[in-house]
Amino acid sequence: MGKLRILSGKEVCIILSTHGFCEVHRRGSHIVMQKRLVDSTITVPVPNHDEIRVGTLLSIIRQSDLPRSEFE
C-alpha cells in the first residue's frame, strides 16, 4: 500500500464520479455523492475543503467500497 495523496474535496468527487457516483446535493461545505446499485444505494458525504484529512479520506474510501489504490 502506497501513501495517500493530499486531495481536495473536488478531486475526491472526480474520482468517485469516474466510478459511477453522482452528486445528489450540496449543503454547506459538504457534497453528497451517491451510487445506485441493483439492491442498494451507496451514499458518501465529501467535505468540500482544499485538503481532506487522512482519516476522513480513509472513511470515504471505506464507505465507497473503492480500492485504496484509486486515491493514491
Segments predicted by a language model, with ranges:
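Basic nucleic-acid-binding interfaces
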Residues: 1-26, 30-72
